[in-house]
Amino acid sequence: QMPGSGGSARVVRLIGMTRAKDMVMLGKRVPALEAKEIGLLTDVAPDSEALTEMIIDYASKLNALAPLSMRSLKRVLNAALDSPLSVALDVEGHSYEKLRWTEDYMEGINAFSERRKPNYKGK
């Protein structure tokens, strides 16, 4: 019944100690809608066709974003969860300062002021 690969640590962070103990210690299976309600899932698809559409839509949205910013944001969010606040703030500040000098940063600003979609290059 012991979760592997850090599952016990992750589930506590996602749904809290009480729910995690109930679910993990009793080996409870959580239905999809309940998993969404308690924060284990962000969305639920009614069938495989809808799931495929949701995945394509999600991937399209991610693909339209600035890749350097997304990579940095992932690191910042992970630091926010795993580090003291002072460390997380340092990681965020350093990441922001580094991104300010990229071509993608300027493309985002220019696209906003020109009221057009940005064309990010990952540079």
Question: In which residue ranges do the predicted regions lie?
Answer:
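Structural motif
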Residues: 38-39, 115
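C-terminal long alpha-helix characteristic of the crotonase
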Residues: 41-90, 119-123
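Acidic, divalent-metal-coordinating active-site segment for phosphoryl/phosphodiester hydrolysis
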Residues: 27-34
